[in-house]
Structure formats: structure tokens, C-alpha cells
């Protein structure tokens, strides 16, 4: 296992000025800032990240991309004998499998399916919805144009999505109303057809 140099704590980050920085491994800093946080790697560490897991930037944010660093240097982290590392390691694998399935599969050799990954499941649903009108915004009956018990929706046709499940829309805007009980903002996508939207005339 190569020896890596310790580095000074980051003074500036992509997110903000750090208010806390801990060197978890030589050249691997965990920082928090007033706005966000995550891992910051030295240039040496960034070059040593497995190619399948390496990002273009040295910043691996705390919501998802941190998991790539833990997996990439898993053996070194394990050698520290941190009593909580087993939990962190399991969470890292779960996070990467769900949210970075292509990178995780490329690194581990596992075949990741939609049942294993939230992102792949979302992509599957979106690809099945291409051509339909997808909801882009919704308003409750607090809005002056939405009757009581309804949800007002606006949307465009779904043209596709990328590998992370970010939707690409195209064409004109559509506006309509659906029953409030049918609208669920937690779905990966809401289509006008699935909601039974009653289209409103264009302004």
C-alpha cells in the first residue's frame, strides 16, 4: 500500500470556508462549512482514486459522493480500527449502489439492476414515460387559480433523461388540474396521464 503525504487543512473549499476540518487519512480531509461539506482530497489522493470512482474535482460532497472516497480507500480506513467504520462502510456501499450505480458497478464488477438502485429505477420509469407530459411544477388550492380539492400542474413533454435520472423536457408548456388526492410529490415522475389531468386553455 503506497504511503501518502499528510497535507495542510484546506483553507478554502468549493462550498465555503471550512469551520471544521479533520484529516481522516493522509491527504483525505473531511470538512464542514456553513453551507455544506464532504471530503477534500489532496492532488496525490485524487490521482490515487480508482478510475471508476474518481470525480473530475477533488471535492466529494457529504450527501452522496463521499461514499466514493470511503469505497476507494476502504482498506486504509479499515486499518484505522475505528469502531464505527463498519457502519460507515455499509452506508457508503448502499449510498453508491443507489445513487452512483454506474460507477459502483464498474468498480465492484457487480451487475446493478433497477431493483438495487433508486437512480436506475427512476431512469427506468422516466424512459417508460418518454413522450408523455411530465409535471414540472404544482400548486395547491392556496393558489388563486386552483379550485378547492385540486392541484394545479404545469408541465412539458418528457424527451429523455441522463444516467442520473435528471429529466430532459421539450416543447410547449401545458397547464391543468387534477384531484389533490391523486398527486404525490414523492414519485420519481408525475405524468398528466397518470394523474388524470384536465387540461386548461392556454393563456
Predicted regions and their residues:
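Eukaryotic non-globular interaction segments with acidic/serine-rich, low-complexity composition
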Residues: 1-33
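Short His-Asn-centered micro-motif
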Residues: 42, 60-63
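Short beta-strand micro-motifs in enzyme catalytic cores
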Residues: 37-39, 58, 149-152
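Eukaryotic intrinsically disordered, low-complexity regions
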Residues: 121-203
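Alpha-helical interaction segments
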Residues: 5, 56-59, 89, 93-94
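Short, compact, well-ordered microdomains
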Residues: 63-115, 164-202
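Catalytic phosphate/metal-binding cores of nucleic-acid and nucleotide-processing enzymes, i.e., regions
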Residues: 15-18, 23-26, 47-56, 64-70, ...
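A short, structured beta-strand/loop element
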Residues: 29-54, 161-163
Amino acid at each position: 500500500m503506497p504511503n501518502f503525504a499528510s497535507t495542510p487543512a484546506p483553507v478554502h473549499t468549493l462550498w465555503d470556508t471550512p469551520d471544521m476540518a479533520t484529516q481522516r487519512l493522509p491527504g483525505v480531509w473531511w470538512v464542514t462549512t456553513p453551507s455544506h461539506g464532504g471530503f477534500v482530497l489532496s492532488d496525490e489522493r485524487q490521482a490515487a482514486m480508482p478510475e471508476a470512482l474518481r470525480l473530475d474535482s477533488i471535492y466529494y460532497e457529504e450527501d452522496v459522493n463521499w461514499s466514493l472516497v470511503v469505497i476507494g480507500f476502504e482498506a486504509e480506513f479499515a486499518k484505522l480500527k475505528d469502531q464505527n467504520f463498519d457502519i460507515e462502510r455499509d452506508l457508503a456501499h448502499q449510498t453508491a449502489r443507489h445513487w452512483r450505480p454506474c460507477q459502483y458497478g464498474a468498480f465492484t464488477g457487480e451487475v446493478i439492476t433497477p431493483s438495487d438502485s433508486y437512480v436506475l429505477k427512476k431512469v427506468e420509469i422516466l424512459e417508460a414515460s418518454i413522450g408523455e407530459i411530465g409535471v414540472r411544477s404544482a400548486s395547491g388550492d392556496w393558489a388563486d387559480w386552483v379550485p378547492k380539492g385540486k392541484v394545479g400542474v404545469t408541465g412539458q413533454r418528457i424527451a429523455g433523461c441522463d444516467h442520473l435520472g435528471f429529466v430532459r423536457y421539450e416543447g410547449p408548456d401545458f397547464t391543468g388540474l387534477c384531484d389533490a388526492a391523486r398527486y404525490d410529490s414523492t414519485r420519481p415522475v408525475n405524468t398528466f396521464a397518470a394523474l388524470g389531468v384536465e387540461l386548461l386553455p392556454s393563456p
